């Protein structure tokens, strides 16, 4: 079974290195070979080792590009898609626009919103908490969605600047023990992820996805939105960067076949 794994920002393919072999060869780890996947882990367009678009593109366009990769370039008849952060957003759009090709999606983050907004008191209370949370969360996102090049000129000449910009998110969005980032990530893992941005000189083009989504219409599905009917699994981690909407809200958007509230973990799971 082909399995497309998609990272987000400020992540990279480094996030998946420790699980690729387990998914591709479960028999080496006490599992059954019948459960093996063909694992495809691309750098998103503009990120890392992938090509750089000539101008900003958003997650919906990236969904089309990655669907083409799977169906036309790699010649799979169908596939499964998994993602967190932007990878989850792209998985949403794959489920919406390419349901004939993608048979199921798994997400551990939800950034898209229903065009009709909250419908119950519980959902309205969640929306209020989310809006309040964004006062402190939204600074980097606003910069990258409106003036990414201004930020990039400084960062492209400063590996320390890139490291600080990225590690602040890794620290803030993770389920740390005693506020120690090394309780979750080794220095090698942190530096490997940072160096993907530094060595490939893609800090600037990686931020473009925020600009691209704004041009695509932002976090809301279009007004003519119809529920995504392919099977959808959701993994909810307690230290996610933003609280998930209530289950009732999510059920109006997806055909949820598995809903798992994890005992620990954060945005980068």
Where are these regions (language model features)?
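Alpha/beta-hydrolase active-site loop
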Residues: 53-73
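Short beta-strand element of the alpha/beta-hydrolase
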Residues: 1-8
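Alpha/beta-hydrolase active-site loop signature
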Residues: 10, 45-48, 112, 266-267
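The feature captures the conserved acid-bearing segment of alpha/beta-hydrolase catalytic domains
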Residues: 121-148, 223-227
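The serine-hydrolase catalytic nucleophile loop
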Residues: 9-21
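Conserved hydrolase catalytic core segment
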Residues: 20-36, 69, 73-129, 137
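Glycine-rich "HGGG/HGxG" loop immediately N-terminal to the catalytic nucleophile
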Residues: 14, 29-31, 40, 44-57, ...
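C-terminal subdomain of alpha/beta-hydrolase-fold enzymes, centered on the catalytic histidine
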Residues: 144-269
């Amino acid at each position: 079974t082909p399995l497309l794994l998609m990272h987000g920002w400020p992540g990279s393919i480094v996030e998946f290195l420790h699980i690729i072999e387990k998914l591709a060869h479960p028999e080496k780890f006490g599992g059954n070979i019948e459960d093996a996947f063909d694992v495809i882990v691309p750098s998103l367009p503009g990120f890392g080792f992938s090509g750089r678009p000539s101008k900003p593109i958003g997650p919906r366009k990236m969904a089309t590009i990655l669907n083409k990769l799977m169906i036309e370039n790699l010649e799979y008849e169908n596939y499964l898609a998994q993602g967190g952060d932007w990878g989850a957003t792209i998985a949403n759009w794959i489920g919406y626009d390419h349901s004939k090709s993608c048979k199921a999606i798994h997400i551990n983050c939800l950034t898209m919103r229903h065009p009709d907004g909250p419908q119950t008191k519980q959902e309205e209370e969640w929306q209020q908490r989310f809006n309040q949370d964004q006062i402190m969360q939204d600074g980097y996102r606003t910069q990258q969605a409106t003036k990414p090049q201004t930020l990039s000129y400084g960062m492209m000449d400063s590996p320390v600047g890139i490291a600080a910009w990225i590690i602040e998110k890794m620290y803030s969005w993770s389920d740390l023990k005693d506020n120690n980032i090394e309780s979750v990530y080794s220095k090698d893992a942190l530096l490997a992820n940072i160096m993907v941005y530094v060595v490939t000189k893609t800090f600037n083009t990686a931020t473009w996805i925020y600009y691209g989504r704004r041009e695509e219409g932002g976090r809301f599905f279009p007004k003519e939105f119809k529920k995504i009917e392919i099977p959808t699994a959701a993994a909810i981690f307690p230290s996610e960067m933003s609280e998930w909407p209530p289950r009732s809200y999510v059920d109006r958007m997806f055909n949820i076949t598995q809903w798992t509230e994890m005992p620990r973990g954060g945005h980068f799971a």
